[in-house]
């Protein structure tokens, strides 16, 4: 395996005269994501310090074990308790854990001071995005190639199911797949394990499927996923973000400049994240509970003639062509091609229950198609997927009554759709 070079570099600035990639990092938070960032930085020769708002005596045995591993790997310093500005001395980048709200003290004041000192603030996903770019450059420098598809999933509800299902579909299509992010493991942990097991960069995963929370996205700046979806938006985590607009803006950062945007057309908040001007420049695919209304879209069709069956359908595009959705054109009159709806699978044939899961399945299909995978292979994986624990999981049927574990239903937006199964 080749050594990565400039893994922390901004790809846009890499060739600028005098540009130097950062090499002095302060990691905030001794959790899974913070530890992954610290390990990645140390692995790549950076100077690393760590700070956590908890007292050392409050750390769990697992956290103490992590701390020991980091100190053995070369961690320069670890601070516990209230953040103070002296921690910023010589720091070029702060790596912030998703558990730390930027609007709550002491984090808010600390980050404000960091910005005054022109210190960058990165999420773990920003480290990941730069690492993937560095791997591509390294492979190219050795006459190789590494350009994996990155499929990203966010939304208030349905992230884990859609992420896991997308990974399953891609695997059934014969690809090497890594699933990581909010779903666990941390993206950098999965990246490090993949690097450790690969003989060369070309042996790395073909496709990365990432579940991303608004917490992770807020300080992500250079991710340019192949395709990404926002499944839905309802009020959640407002104590962390401050208000609904800030929450939505964080979610919207999942779309890079070249990302295929996969949008829930039945959710006005989701559709409102893409302006009319942007729609003329972006590749967009929609999914929803209605029949598709444009080429390449996904939806649900109710067939009264067949006893009221709901079908997952796709406004089919030519499988022989590269499956990139068409960009919408403004101020150009184009005669619409007649839609050719292809019935994919009855909704009742899915092993995951409920209309909301039918929408999750459509989003997963759209993501996998955006990665260039043939529909017929994806449908085999769709039929097999049994869902994730605690998400409308059938436990037993006793005397005609079905008992369901939906203990992950912790907000109104999550519970409501289950009652309309």
Model-derived features with residue positions:
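Residues in the short beta-alpha loop(s) of Rossmann-like NAD(P)-binding domains
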Residues: 31, 54-56, 183, 267, ...
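Short gly/ser/thr-rich secondary-structure transition/capping motifs
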Residues: 5-11, 73-81, 122-126, 185, ...
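N-terminal leader/targeting and accessory segments in enzymes
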Residues: 1-123, 127, 134, 353
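Nucleotide phosphate-binding/pyrophosphate-handling subdomain across enzymes
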Residues: 16-24, 36-44, 344-421
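Extended acidic/charged loop-beta regions that coordinate divalent cations
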Residues: 85-87, 144, 197-239, 274-347, ...
């Amino acid at each position: 395996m080749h050594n990565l070079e400039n893994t922390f570099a901004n790809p846009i600035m890499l060739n600028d005269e005098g540009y130097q990639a950062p090499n002095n990092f302060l990691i905030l938070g001794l959790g899974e994501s913070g530890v992954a960032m610290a390990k990645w930085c140390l692995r790549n020769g950076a100077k690393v310090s760590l700070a956590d708002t908890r007292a050392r005596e409050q750390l769990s045995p697992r956290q103490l074990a992590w701390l020991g591993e980091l100190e053995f790997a070369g961690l320069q310093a670890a601070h516990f308790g209230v953040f103070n500005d002296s921690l910023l001395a010589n720091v070029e980048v702060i790596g912030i854990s998703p558990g730390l709200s930027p609007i709550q003290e002491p984090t808010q004041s600390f980050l404000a001071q960091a910005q005054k000192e022109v210190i960058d603030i990165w999420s773990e996903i920003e480290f990941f995005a730069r690492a993937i770019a560095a791997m591509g450059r390294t492979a190219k420098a050795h006459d190789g190639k590494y350009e994996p598809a990155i499929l990203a999933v966010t939304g208030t509800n349905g992230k884990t199911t859609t992420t896991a299902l997308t990974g399953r579909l891609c695997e059934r299509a014969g690809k090497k797949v890594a699933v990581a992010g909010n779903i666990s493991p941390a993206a950098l942990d999965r990246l490090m394990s993949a690097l450790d097991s690969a003989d060369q960069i070309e042996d790395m995963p073909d496709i990365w499927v990432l579940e991303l929370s608004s917490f992770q996205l807020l300080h992500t700046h250079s991710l340019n996923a192949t395709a990404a979806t926002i499944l839905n938006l309802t009020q959640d985590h407002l104590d962390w973000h401050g208000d609904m607009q800030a929450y939505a803006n964080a979610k919207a950062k999942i779309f890079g400049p070249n990302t295929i945007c996969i949008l829930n057309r039945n959710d006005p908040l989701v559709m409102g994240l893409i302006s009319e001007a942007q729609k003329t420049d972006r590749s967009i695919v929609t999914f929803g509970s209605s029949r598709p209304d444009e080429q390449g879209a996904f939806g649900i069709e109710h067939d009264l003639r067949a006893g009221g069956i709901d079908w997952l359908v796709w406004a089919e595009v030519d499988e022989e062509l590269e499956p990139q959705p068409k960009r919408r054109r403004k101020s150009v009159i184009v005669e619409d091609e007649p839609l050719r709806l292809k019935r994919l699978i009855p909704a009742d044939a899915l092993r995951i229950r409920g209309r909301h899961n039918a929408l999750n399945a459509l989003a997963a299909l759209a993501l996998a198609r955006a990665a260039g995978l043939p529909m017929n292979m994806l449908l085999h994986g769709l039929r097999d997927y049994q869902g994730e624990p605690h998400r409308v999981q059938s436990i037993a049927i006793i005397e005609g009554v079905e008992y369901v574990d939906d203990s992950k239903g912790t907000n109104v937006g999550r519970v409501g759709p289950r009652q309309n199964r």
